[in-house]
Amino acid sequence: MPTLFISDLHLEIEKPDLTRFFFNFLDKVAPNAEALYILGDFFEVWVGDDEQSPLQVEVAQRLHKLAEAGTHIHLMHGNRDFLIGETYAKQCGATLLAEPHALDLYGVPSLLMHGDSLCTLDAAYQKARATFRNPAFQSQFLSRPLDQRQLTARQMRQISMAKNQGKAEVIMDVAPDEVINTFNTYGIELLIHGHTHRPDTHRYNLPQGEVKRIVLGDWGEETWYGRADADGFQLLNLKAEDIA
């Protein structure tokens, strides 16, 4: 049975077609998998496990159903949903992974990340990321009333979008030196991440041999997801209409 990797769904109530695409994926692709890894930005925004919107509840129910059928589900934080907690992970029947997460993938030393920590050329973003990932900041934010958290999240998203419009594309992509450093630090042959919305397979010739970096796609009318088994890793294109 294969292992599947997806990221950057950015689920939100305003995009029902996207939710339907994901549910069709769960019904028609994921049941054949040993495990499903969701590598961040699963939701467009997350302000706490206590929000329990109809979308969040239905997504949890669908994932839990898949987990009960035998597929192991793993969640990793992204830059939009880093406040997902153990409560919601349990509701989904999923395991919440720390980032980065190392694993032996059918004999291949591998590392899973969301990918934003690789974008070190964007110094302003990395500074903000350090603040948002600080446990003290998160605890203080989560202690506020839900409506205040929702308002703050909307305001911060507007600010982020405005800032990103003025950034060069190269700044928002991964830094090559950071990628090489990650391979060397963890001694891996395969790096899998999302975040950049630039699905591709990148190969590097390092002293230890050829290594690969797989970038997963975001979701819209189509996506690019990862499929691994004993025969290797594939980055596969999937159109929503193909599983409607």
From Swiss-Prot:
Cellular localisation: Cell inner membrane
Enzyme superclass (EC): hydrolase
Domain of life: Bacteria
Primary location recorded for the protein, binned into one broad class: membrane
GO CC term (a single one): extrinsic component of plasma membrane
Pathway(s) annotated for this protein in UniProt: Glycolipid biosynthesis; lipid IV(A) biosynthesis; lipid IV(A) from (3R)-3-hydroxytetradecanoyl-[acyl-carrier-protein] and UDP-N-acetyl-alpha-D-glucosamine: step 4/6
Binding site for Mn(2+) 2: 41, 79, 114, 195
Assigned EC number: 3.6.1.54
Keyword Manganese belongs to the record: yes
Catalysis: reaction(s): UDP-2-N,3-O-bis[(3R)-3-hydroxytetradecanoyl]-alpha-D-glucosamine + H2O = 2-N,3-O-bis[(3R)-3-hydroxytetradecanoyl]-alpha-D-glucosaminyl 1-phosphate + UMP + 2 H(+)
Function field: Hydrolyzes the pyrophosphate bond of UDP-2,3-diacylglucosamine to yield 2,3-diacylglucosamine 1-phosphate (lipid X) and UMP by catalyzing the attack of water at the alpha-P atom. Involved in the biosynthesis of lipid A, a phosphorylated glycolipid that anchors the lipopolysaccharide to the outer membrane of the cell.
Protein's recorded name: UDP-2,3-diacylglucosamine hydrolase
Organism, scientific name: Hahella chejuensis (strain KCTC 2396)
Taxonomy of the source species: Bacteria, Pseudomonadati, Pseudomonadota, Gammaproteobacteria, Oceanospirillales
